[in-house]
Amino acid sequence: MFAMKRREFIAASAAVAASSLLPQTPAWARGRKVRLAMIGTGMRGLVLLKELVRRDDVEVVALCDIEPIMLGRAMDMVAKAGKPAPKTYGQDRDTHAWKRLLEQKGIDGVIIATPWEYHAPMAIAAMQAGVAVGCEVVAGITLQDHWDVLKTQLSTGTPYMLLENVCYRRDVMAALQMVRQGLFGELVHLQAGYQHDLRGVKFNSGDPNQPYDSGVEFGPKGWSEARWRTEHSVERNGELYPSHGIGPCAMYTGINRGNRFTHINAFATKARGLHEYTVAKSGGTTHPSTKVKFKLGDIVTTTLACENGETILLQHDTSLPRPYSMGFRVQGTKGLWMDVNHSIHIEGRSPPHQWEEFKKYQDEYEHPLWKQNADTAASAGHGGMDWFVIHAFVEALKAKAPMPIDIYDAVTWSAITPLSEQSIANSFQTLEFPDFTAGAWKQRKPIFAFDGKY
């Protein structure tokens, strides 16, 4: 059924399992510097670059972007941090410049922060070159992309980490502590999603100094994400951005480590929000953007069934007016947490049939990573999450240890997108979820955020 044969995975998985015996933070690694490159210095890339240049154990040796303005901003950031100037690629707008970057000698790892469609080919090429990959979320576009990325990682042994920052969100990590200590009892049902009004991100004026909420252009006339992300709303209908929600839920339920997804289906509403936005923002129906037919349903609801009996519901909601929320709900036999109302209820501890404020529980169950690093992470992007995810990648790379969000996590979470598209296109069909681990999920043990190091 799939391009990579089961026996190939079994053989390769054995090697990966052996690598899990490596020590997490050997003493020799503590003072080691890593030489990192970055492909993609757009708005997201600059946020991650900020975290790299503030570290004494990282040397940024190469940067690549085909937009000279953004490459220039990246170079300015490195200079202001007092770090040596890295070699640059792409200022001539050569779309293959990233390949030359990967030929540069002495690169330990690369951060990939480009448009989604480039993630898989860039990660594959980097791993084939022996360069460790820290990939921004979305591991691939098609299901075959995910098998190809996985096959390359297993055959080369080159480290790969999906840079899913929400796994490190403060309340999310406190909830992880609660799950592991049995506060919710046995988990039964979880919910999450990417619920974020992106209308002002998918469209802008095309002005590099006004990337958000500034117009209705997209594609070649847009800037930043409006230049590429909006096209996915035109051409695709599915759960386009699953990992922010599914990442924490997968950690809670032990996906790929004692548990797995078995089935998936998805439903999509009609598409109205982006059209109405362009009409209202442009003041009529004459602008070309108002005539575009968007394929992406305004709300996409995806349901996953797990081997151990849990269900997980995801919602993708980016085309309608709304406040930001991930919509987390973690529910078990003893109670539940819901992040929308910042509330929790634990049977035998909470007043009957009443919510309690989550904050006091969060303080009680604060994860050791946040206890140790809250002050350091305070100035980082996304409430500190970006510091933690970069810290994890760098520390694991220095220690030659398994990545805390590994290749199996990456392809499993990201494959929800093409599978949801397939389900919707086939009258909301329920599909079997592929086992990317080839059965290794039965023996693999959880490693994420256990030792207080990363």
Curated annotation (Swiss-Prot):
Its cofactor is NAD(+). Residues 1-29 form the signal peptide. Gene3D superfamilies: Dihydrodipicolinate Reductase, domain 2, NAD(P)-binding Rossmann-like Domain. Binds 1 NAD(+) per subunit. The NAD(+) cannot dissociate. InterPro entries: Gfo/Idh/MocA-like_OxRdtase_N (IPR000683), Gfo/Idh/MocA_oxidrdct_glycsds (IPR050463), Glyco_hydro_109_C (IPR049303), NAD(P)-bd_dom_sf (IPR036291), TAT_signal (IPR006311). PROSITE patterns: TAT. Keywords: Glycosidase, Hydrolase, NAD, Signal. Predicted to be exported by the Tat system. The position of the signal peptide cleavage has not been experimentally proven. Its EC number is 3.2.1.-. Substrate binds at residues 194, 229, 241-244, 324. It holds the Pfam family Glyco_hydro_109_C. GO terms for molecular function: hydrolase activity, acting on glycosyl bonds; nucleotide binding. NAD(+) binds at residues 43-44, 65, 116-119, 136-137, 165, 224-228, 241. Belongs to the Gfo/Idh/MocA family. Glycosyl hydrolase 109 subfamily. Glycosidase. This is Glycosyl hydrolase family 109 protein. It comes from Stenotrophomonas maltophilia (strain K279a). The lineage of its organism: Bacteria, Pseudomonadati, Pseudomonadota, Gammaproteobacteria, Lysobacterales.
